Every structure is written in structure tokens, then in C-alpha cells.
Amino acid sequence: IGDASAIWDDSENGFKSIPQNGDYSIRHDSLYLHYTSNNTLFGTQFHHLPDSNGKPRVLDASSDIMGVPLDVSAHDLIYAGAQKNLGPSGVTVVILSPWAMERVPKDIPTMLDYSVHSSKGSLFNTPNTFGIFVLDRVFSWIERNGGLEGAISRNKAKSDLLYKELDRSKFWIPHANKDCRSVMNVTWRLPSIELEEKFLQESLEAGLGGLKGHRSVGGIRASLYNGCPIESVEALVR
């Protein structure tokens, strides 16, 4: 729905970086700038607020919300699927500004109309009650364990520990450039596909699963979401 334009593309570089301010230009007739803060496939992440040239910012924060610092006030719309950091799939958290609420097109389908959902108290259709219940439990758990500051600190400690080990030897080949490495998804390669398969098999035998990279890119990927304890990273590093 709508006329969208991609204003930056790192495909020729293998998606190892994210755009810095000044690397792209925004169409003068654009209504907003949309970006995704964390790339789960390639392990890259924004660590700065992208310049929007005065346009409202719309953010997909599905894979790092409540896991890294986020300036909510700098955005007019933030949406995030809960299935990474907040709870089970089937629940989406949406944060809207008055600007976004006032600009819903009249001909948009009701299921995509945030104003409809807001006016009905998020009960326009039968909600995923179990998913919302689990979401509430996760929020309570985060509050009991240091709140957002605690979650952010734990995630940084986990990723710092793993990146330190990956940088220790040239045998490991981290994918993302250092200035945009993801705190949530650490991705790397080994010298050969055969060694990667051997690493994954031996990791599984040691009780460490879920390390295979996304099917579209391969390699190794460790997802360090809020629910991942630092003990898991310590075991991987050992």
C-alpha cells in the first residue's frame, strides 16, 4: 500500500554495514522515513538515530525492542512483533504518535487501520489472549530484573563476550563491520562450509543448538535475545 522507495542498498557489500547519516538522500515528497533497527539475518544494527531530513520516523523494532536503547520520542510510529524479545508470536506492539493517528488513509482496510484498533481498545477482533498474557509475564520479569537498564546491560555483556572471542582468532570471521555489529544477533563464518557443519554438529553434541545461520545466508548465528542467559554465551565461548 503506497509508493515506497529504497534509498540505500548494501547488497554489493554483502549487507555488512548500515547507512551512516549522509549516505542517502530522501525524496522531498516522502511522508516519512521507514527503517528496521536490527537485521537478524546478517547481524547488523543501527547504533545511531538515522537522519530523516525532518520527516517523521517509522521504525520496525521487532528484533531488538526492550533489548537496546531506543529513543521513543524521536519516532512517530514504532511497531514490533513480540516473538523475539517480548513473548510468543502472534502479538504485535505498536506505539503511535498523534501525527500517525491523524494520517490513516480513508480507504485502508480496517484490519490495517490503527485508528480502528485504538478506538476499540485493541479489541476490534478477538485478541490472542494467551500471547498477551505471556507478554505481561515477560514485562513483569523484565521489571523484576532491573527493568530496561538491566536488560540492556545484560545484552551488551553477552554480545561483548562473544565478539571478544570471535576477534581473538582469525579462524572466526565475523560478518558485520565492527561499527554496526548487532547486540541481538551475532553472525560469523568459518574458513569452509565443511568446518561450519562440523562446528554445528559438535555444538549440538555439547548441548548448544540453534546456531545455524538463516537458510538464505548460511554461516553461524547466535541470537542473544532477552530470554538468553549469559551462561549460554559463556558455554559457547568455552
List PLM regions with ranges.
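Membrane helical hairpin/interfacial module
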Residues: I1-D3
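Active-site phosphate-binding strand-loop segment of PLP-dependent enzymes
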Residues: D10-I65
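A short secondary-structure junction signal
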Residues: S17-P19, G43-H48, G67-S73, S89-T92, ...
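Conserved active-site segment immediately N-terminal to the catalytic lysine
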Residues: V58, V72-Q83
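Active-site C-terminal subdomain of aminotransferase-like
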Residues: A82-K164, N177
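A short linear hydrophobic-aromatic micro-motif
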Residues: F171-H175, G207-G213
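Conserved PLP-binding catalytic core of the aspartate aminotransferase-like
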Residues: W172-S203
